[in-house]
């Protein structure tokens, strides 16, 4: 077989493989979107009645929801007439379903909610082992909230680094109060992604494009604020909390906090 023919066959094989990978990702997105929900609150006397605060995703038995703790806190204002819950549906045709906050992990900025009513399609969680740098990933959420209707948006991402949530600074004056508090706790690794996300993406699942298995939770407020406290202009870097911490919070009893 001549060298040009071999190169042609190799090129065709690469093209076919790339097409198959793209097709797999499209199928994964369609499946994952069924499990991605908005997080917010409902108050009948307010206009609009439903206020969006972030993204979450369904796990376990189809009634458990994982999101960021700060997303839930934003929805809990102590008003007895206000109810925390999830928002499902597409476009303008969305539905609000009440939820109960089961447990909150302030250290890793995660929360576990349980919804009322029928179960929804659930995502599978990874085994908790840290991923290898260089892995291609995807994440789906609501970067713009409900401003233009409830439309989930998917982004590709590259796991560019695994770093401590807070790095000791050469100058203590560059560390904010939150960073100093975190240094006093046990530091844990977070995923640094080569992708752009927005505050509405907080709580979005980070998953394998081929399998849909979730390996992390996007965090655009808590982690980003700690990691970039010494930077005058925040970067476009996206961070995610490893899924092992979501696995831990799912095992806690109702009302437990950390």
List the predicted regions and their residue ranges.
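Short, conserved beta-turn/loop elements at beta-strand boundaries and strand-helix junctions
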Residues: 61, 104-108, 162-168
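Short, well-ordered loop/turn sites that connect or cap secondary structure elements
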Residues: 59-60, 78, 131, 209
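Beta-strand/loop subdomains of soluble extracytoplasmic proteins
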Residues: 82-85, 90-99, 133-138, 152-176
